[in-house]
Amino acid sequence: MRHTEFWERMTEALGSSSYATVWSEQQVMASLGGRTVQEALAAGESPKLVWRAVWENLELPMSLR
């Protein structure tokens, strides 16, 4: 998964790109080692791995996996 696809999915899941950005800066997730989405991506985690954590955290439907 590319970063552009990751952010498209975030926008789809959260309803707007601005909310997706804020959420990704503020929501700390244990599944990302106690980091935010932004921190995990900046540390080099793959967008696919980060998306999986977001998907599980938000309890999104399988169709958005």
Q: What role is predicted for each listed range?
A:
Residues M1-R65:
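C-terminal alpha-helical interaction appendages
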